[in-house]
Amino acid sequence: MKKWTIAASLSIGVLALSACNSDDEIVAETEAGNITKEEFYEELKDVNGESTLQQLVTVKVLEDNYEVTDEELEEEISTMKEGFPSEEDFNTTVEQQFGGEEQLREIMYVSMLQEKAAAEDVEITEEDLQELYERKNTEIQAQHILLENEEDVAEVQQKIEDGEDFGELAQEYSTDTGSAENGGDLGYFSAGSMVPEFEEAAFSLEAGEISDPVQSTHGTHIIKVNDVREKEESIGEFEDVKKELEREILLNRVDQTQIQEKINKLIQDAGVQINVEGMEDLFEAEETEENTTEEDAQG
């Protein structure tokens, strides 16, 4: 999203320049020669023009289909502030990472528009929310063995079935250097701490149970749960945290590729016409690329 902010800032400059009356207007003077508005505009267009225009059109199309209210944006910013020890810490971090709160608001605004587009195709039931709420009020203590190839998976599974010690197997086989030397011990954790595939498997186990192999972006896990207990401090009343739970489920179920495909479809349906010389086919190229990807997947 930072990229969008930079692009948007550049586009403001480009639009301001294009609004000037004369292409010969001087925007910079040097002893070596002057730089005209036209030269500056053409350079900005050549370097950042396509990405800037793509981002501006994307935001315009999203705004035509979805709405993020001032109240929603304020609530989001307030929630972020609660995660910092003080408002001064929040302001310092925001200044360092985003260039200021105004830039952060722009980023959050576009992010929330994208989330609304993604949420349209995802069904989240009351049961889903209740299940996540219960998990977040529960913590489990587990060990795991992370493996990289099928041969090791089969070998470790067999040794577990033969009764060998799980911790010793983790020390011998696990590629997770952070936990292997401790017998694969991950300590206590609650929902939202691990990758979704791992978490789903771990929270489905009772104390003392060992999972089947679980695939994640890190490799193949074999998980053993040793203890399940209620957290000492609740995350809050269900109705108070319901919106946060819904967002977490949404982000776990939708990846960036799916969001981009949805946005591309909205842009296609919006009948976008580009009137900048050299960029007339900007979104047609995106559409062709998307269709090619779909054909490759089907083939």
Swiss-Prot record:
Isomerase found in the keyword field: yes
Annotated Gene3D superfamilies: 3.10.50.40
Keyword terms: Cell membrane, Isomerase, Lipoprotein, Membrane, Palmitate, Rotamase, Signal
Residues annotated as domain PpiC: 137-227
Residues covalently joined to lipid (N-palmitoyl cysteine): C20
GO terms, biological process: protein folding
Position of the signal peptide: 1-19
Documented EC number(s): 5.2.1.8
Lipidation (S-diacylglycerol cysteine): C20
GO cellular component: plasma membrane
A GO molecular function held by the record: peptidyl-prolyl cis-trans isomerase activity
KW Amino-acid biosynthesis (keyword) present: no
Catalyzed reactions per annotation: [protein]-peptidylproline (omega=180) = [protein]-peptidylproline (omega=0)
Membrane topology category: Lipid-anchor
Transmembrane intervals: none
Subcellular location: Cell membrane
Family under the similarity heading: Belongs to the PrsA family.
Function in brief: Plays a major role in protein secretion by helping the post-translocational extracellular folding of several secreted proteins.
The protein, known as: Foldase protein PrsA
Organism field: Oceanobacillus iheyensis (strain DSM 14371 / CIP 107618 / JCM 11309 / KCTC 3954 / HTE831)
